[in-house]
Design a protein with these regions (language model features):
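Ser/Thr/Asn(+Pro)-rich, low-complexity disordered segments
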Residues: 1-373
Length: 373
């Protein structure tokens, strides 16, 4: 799965592959692809990943599609591996047979403790990246973001020696705030809306609370409503923003890719939020399970712009305040979250159904302390 199109023709994004694998059941259910063809794609992809260079089961962020080797400068990434496994497990449960066997094999070989750091106070967190050349780790998942699926996969590891301490899910900062008169929610560092979506594409957090009583699904509902209101309140500053054009998220922008776009509240200084008028349709569309009415209204609005359409649906982003700028590319992870959330909304939670039926995932939810409400 390419990272983007038409740009970077040789670069594959591991997270995008995960989204693509989980999209195959959606494609089959909607008769977009024959089941045998989809199964063959899934099996071929997993066979390729079985032989890709990895460390303790963790994959690099990017690989060359022509050589199947890590892209230059790419780090080994825990979150991208987790999103890939989310798709692999979903496809495995849907297709069964060799696809399921391969998915289980790839999941089984991941040593989640390899990426774990223990702090002086005894708390544990995942590192963000690993540089195999220097044998050093970088960053830490010490703040709420898109990483919840990592704890689910780590707690459900098929091999007990590779399994994380479930308390890790409670060892990152859970700061709560509000935007305007909205409901409070645990917010992410940059306030980017994708951080409230990615794990939710796979893990069904509906009607569940963790040991601290947090309903993560409702948390994303409140975050999505806040993201929309933020754009409504700033529509006088940025022509792209409005009640049907919202959801600041990492995306292409007139100045290049920007991973820091987001709304309030956020862990970073709110007065320094990067809000430069660019909107990615994936922001609002990725929240369709949280705010269906608002997200569908946004989709209808976006399709009014002829220049925003492309071979693969809506382009990655646009900015009406900057010479009516439209992105040239579509990006794999942005298309991925759009398709998976649409599938969950339209096809009765199809990705949730197959990911959550995996026996290791069910055990993980119990180990992490989730209960039904």
């Amino acid at each position: 799965m390419r990272d983007r199109y038409p740009g970077s023709p040789d670069q594959s994004s591991v997270a995008s592959v995960g989204f693509a694998l989980a999209a195959l059941p959606i494609a089959v259910k909607n008769a977009w692809v024959e089941e045998d063809v989809a199964r063959s794609r899934a099996e071929g992809t997993l066979k390729t990943f079985k032989n890709l260079k990895n460390y303790s089961g963790f994959y690099y962020h990017f690989y060359s599609m022509s050589t199947a080797t890590p892209s230059s400068g790419s780090e080994v990434s825990v979150i991208d591996t987790a999103l890939f496994l989310g798709g692999a497990i979903t496809a495995g449960e849907f297709f069964g047979g060799n696809v399921k066997s391969l998915a289980n094999e790839l999941y089984e070989r991941v040593d989640w403790n390899f990426f774990t750091k223990t702090n002086a106070n005894g708390s544990k967190q995942f590192y963000m990246g690993y540089n195999a050349t220097t044998d050093t780790f970088s960053g830490a998942w010490d703040y709420y973001a898109e990483q919840l699926i990592m704890y689910v996969l780590g707690a459900g590891a098929p091999k007990s020696e590779y399994r994380i301490d479930p308390r890790m899910m409670y060892d990152f900062a859970r700061n709560k705030g509000t935007y305007g008169d909205g409901e409070p929610f645990i917010y992410s560092y940059f306030g980017s809306i994708f951080t409230y979506q990615f794990s939710h594409a796979f893990v069904d957090f509906r009607d569940k609370v963790d040991e601290n009583g947090v309903n993560w699904f409702e948390n994303s509902v409140n975050a999505s409503i806040a993201a929309r209101q933020y754009c409504i309140d700033n529509a006088d500053k940025y022509a792209t923003y409005g009640e049907n054009s919202w959801g600041l998220t990492a995306c292409d922008s007139p100045s290049g890719y920007n991973g820091y776009l987001g709304g309030q509240p956020s862990g970073y200084k709110n007065e320094s939020r990067q809000s430069e008028g660019t909107i990615a349709p994936a922001g609002a569309l990725g929240s369709i399970v949280f705010t269906p009415e608002y997200s569908i209204a946004a989709l209808r609005h976006y399709y009014e712009f002829d220049d925003l359409r492309s071979r693969y649906g809506l382009r990655d982003a646009f900015n009406l305040a900057n010479r009516n700028w439209y992105a040239e590319d579509v990006i794999g992870i942005d298309k991925g979250i759009t398709v998976l959330m649409a599938g969950n909304y339209i096809n009765d939670g199809i990705v949730w159904k197959y990911f959550m039926q995996n026996k290791n995932i069910r055990k993980a939810m119990d180990r992490l302390g989730f209960t039904e409400v």
